[in-house]
């Protein structure tokens, strides 16, 4: 059985749903959207309630639950690499932080040959196009887009305000909008949540407006086996439905677009015969095109938590107790309000640790409870924590297919903490975080340091803590990078080098990881490239002003000095 469409999109995630929605705005264009996971069940609180964000990571229904190979610089730990499975992709299970990256990230991309139209001012109109911000549009934010963005409001947890004030007291800037004129500094953090308190995944935002169109066909539980080629032209795909071993074939008249994410996109290309020749030949995969960069240049954000006891009963600790959860769930279900309606990452910041960094190299997420991101190891008392992570590690990893079997996970290695810069940034980051947490704004709340613990002071002690406790921020990217050099996989429009009718459009095509969470930027990339595919003129460049640190000092004098080992 074979079906024919103009475009086949592999992966209904942040990029794939955006592309499917935009391409089918043209009524004469037919699109097949394939998703290996299931629907985004709207009555499943695990994916729809913002405060329940840890639940999908604990199971396999919505999570691919990849693991890395033993990471050599992390005591050989096999580390989590959760990715979303189901309509919405990772936007169905992420932390819902709406952060776009720093303007300098995109200006840096645009300095690379062939990527001249990826400057921040070229990208900003597409960020705005995708967004509806609840407090209204301005030069930086949209008011008519599919992605619902909610801003923190007065009356939220007092710890958010105290942690931002502590950052300012430590000598860093205050910013009212981490996606506006100035990212650098501390301030409120927007979230992809609807006005009714539901997760704003791309399934809800984009597919809800597109799924009834007669020119869009969506198939869930459809695991793409490989891309089919006629010479160097992509002509279709084969896929498996559910547990069946029968391969279904679909043909593409125009293009196959791979939007499977930074892990699965290179895996699919390699399995289809597009990738490093030696790897493919070692697995008896017929080589369609020797493209050495497929699966290389893999990047991520690593982070750790600094946890503190809270001396006042204002943290979210009571919400972790089962007997309080029915009332929280009921308020969220019927009113769309309360603790359940927030991801609880309502404040954060970006700082530079040293003058050689021209824009922030450390990100903070503040959380008014002490618990692991995946919901494990909750501290059994009132507490709060700062998630601290480096933004642009020089470490580079890789994805390698292990077999022709589409159900076998690939070999994943990030090489976390493999450079001296990594260690310097994390040591600096821990010490600067302690200085922030010691400021007067937190005096009414701060108890003992739970983790790492006040006795962890020397470089050696900090390094041991980092090796044992640092975790992924779940931001894999850059494994099919845009560019023109020998290791580039696609051009500035996502077209695979040396091939015809084949694109990759998702976080894997970022040439360098951005300063912040990836979801908003992945959607922007898909919005921008969809105009290219449709032959539309790009949106006019923005004229908005944006902050460049230049010679500005990294920080001012802290209100309270802290002596550390």
UniProtKB/Swiss-Prot annotation:
All disulfide bonds of the chain are none
Highest taxon of source? Bacteria
User: Which positions bind FAD?
Assistant: 6-35
> So what EC number does this one have?
1.1.99.1, 1.2.1.8
Active site: residue positions? 475 (proton acceptor)
Query: Membrane among the record's keywords?
Result: no
Q: Which reaction does it catalyse?
A: choline + A = betaine aldehyde + AH2; betaine aldehyde + NAD(+) + H2O = glycine betaine + NADH + 2 H(+)
Example GO BP? glycine betaine biosynthetic process from choline
Please name the pathway.
Amine and polyamine biosynthesis; betaine biosynthesis via choline pathway; betaine aldehyde from choline (cytochrome c reductase route): step 1/1
GO molecular function of the protein, one example?
flavin adenine dinucleotide binding
Q: What is a single Pfam family found in this protein's UniProt entry? A: GMC_oxred_N
Q: Where is this region: Disordered?
A: 182-201
The coenzyme or cofactor needed here is: FAD
Annotated GO CC locations: membrane
Sorted keywords for this record are: FAD, Flavoprotein, NAD, Oxidoreductase
Question: PANTHER family, alphabetically?
Answer: CHOLINE DEHYDROGENASE, MITOCHONDRIAL, GLUCOSE-METHANOL-CHOLINE GMC OXIDOREDUCTASE
Biological function:
Involved in the biosynthesis of the osmoprotectant glycine betaine. Catalyzes the oxidation of choline to betaine aldehyde and betaine aldehyde to glycine betaine at the same rate.
Q: Give the family this protein belongs to, as stated in its UniProt record.
A: Belongs to the GMC oxidoreductase family.
Name the record gives this protein = Oxygen-dependent choline dehydrogenase
What organism is this sequence from?
Answer: Pseudomonas putida (strain ATCC 47054 / DSM 6125 / CFBP 8728 / NCIMB 11950 / KT2440)
Its lineage opens with: Bacteria, Pseudomonadati, Pseudomonadota, Gammaproteobacteria, Pseudomonadales
